[in-house]
Each structure stands twice: as structure tokens, then as C-alpha cells.
């Protein structure tokens, strides 16, 4: 605890705090939001952490690839198969795990790869940081998750290249913080009434054997749902394709079934939002760029 208000910072002291916490409460994980605008939390002026007795989806993610850090032979490295670019460090040695994490964070802060729009700084403004998470397993292994973040902007993406892109703002426009990084969608309250209206329009169109354009047309007449119109048209058409190609084939859907379908589609949008936040994409170019970063360590 600290009686002084200190701005968010990811450094040696912050990592020590995370490790101290899991040593004292090994059944809890703990993490911190990133310490830069756009990729950080909503309160950058106040140093704070978040934790709990819960296993987030990121923690269960498959290992896409393992790597070694020659400076830290006691630490096992892994690239997680996750929408964001997440490195996991594992070790029974607290000291080595902490040092390895600090080493990677320091390297990332100064790393530039223009081919994938990653810039350490522009005009003296830093862009690279991490969202760190630490937990301690029952067998005494420390796990450190480092989500690589970059808050660079562009003319095309003025809110951030690695921030939710405009086509998904109807669902999620806000920053991707610690909880979202780990796989839990924190969505704006406005979606509750808006998606209820989307569902109501889709139900009416199904009942009256309407095509997808009818959904689009109705939603564009309401200022609270116009932002969802194009997406709703797409998922309505997708729903029809899953049946017999007509709305009658899905007319028997219950209200709860339709709501679940819409919410599942929201989840798909959220996964794309997380992909937007990933600095190294899961394509050939992104994989090669990630390998270049690891080789630079």
C-alpha cells in the first residue's frame, strides 16, 4: 500500500510488487494495466493492480511455440496462441523469472520494427509497454504473462493502430485493459438496450420471412441502433444460411436462442478487437516479425 498517488508505471518495483503478492497469496493471480495512454487502463494517474482467484482464458491458452532466453537458462519461454501477442515465462526461481520479465520489458520498450508499424518512440514520445500478469502454481512455478503493447497512432487509425478498429466500435471502442487482455469482455452498458432492439428487429423479420436488408433498413431508422445495422444484416444473413436459406427455417428459434446467437456473434467481434490489439498478427508477416523480436533478445 502507498499513501501517495503515483502514476502508473511498469518497472522493477512494479514487478516486485506482483511477485510479492503471489508469494503471499499463491491462490490469486495479479496483474497491472499498461502504463501508457490508449493501451493502458482508464486511470493512468494512479498506480494500482488487479487480481483474483480466477483462471482467465489467456491462462489456459495453448502454447504456439517455445523459446529460450540464453541469459536465463532457468526460465522457459512460450508464445501463447492468443489474439494478442503474449509471451509466457515459467520458472521455479522467483529471481530468474523476475529478471527475465524485466529484461524483455526493457528490450520491448526500445524495439522498433517499421514493417509491422511498431515504433519504440516518435518525437520523443514512447509507444511500447506491456500488460503484465503473474501467478504462482501449486508446484511452485511462477508464471509471468507479458502482453506486448504499442500505442502508436496513424491517420487511418487515429485512436491507435493496435486499438479496436472503427468497424468494431459499435461493440467496443474503449481501451483494451488488463481484464480484456486476459479474455473477459468488458463491454459498455449501452449495448444492453441496443442489442435488445437488434434482437427485436431480427425476431420480427424472421416471423415475417424477411431478408437481411429488411433488418438493415429498420435499424438505420433508429439513432441508437444505426451503428449496428451493417453488422446485424451480416449476422442475420449468416443465420439464414445456417437454416434452409429462408427466415422460415429459423422462425422456430426461441427468444433465448436468438439472444444467445447474437451474444455469440458479439463474442466473435470481441475476438477481432483483441486481434486488433495484437502487435504481431497471426499471419506469415506477423509471425516473422515476432521471431525477429525474440531473436533480438
Report residues per predicted region.
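Short, solvent-exposed polar/charged micro-motifs at secondary-structure junctions
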Residues: 39-43, 99, 294-296
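Short, well-ordered, mixed-charge alpha-helical segments that flank or form enzyme active sites
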Residues: 7-8, 37-42, 60
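Helical (often loop-to-helix) elements that flank the catalytic cores of nucleotide-handling enzymes
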Residues: 52-73
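Sequence termini and other peripheral, non-core segments
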Residues: 140-297
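Cation-handling catalytic/transport regions enriched in His/Asp/Glu
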Residues: 47-49, 63, 69, 80-83
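Histidine-centered divalent-metal-coordination microenvironment in nucleic-acid enzymes
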Residues: 39-56, 145
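Catalytic residues for metal-mediated phosphoryl-transfer on nucleic acids/nucleotides
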Residues: 1-34, 55, 76, 80-213
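Solvent-exposed, flexible loop/coil residues
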Residues: 43, 62, 91-93
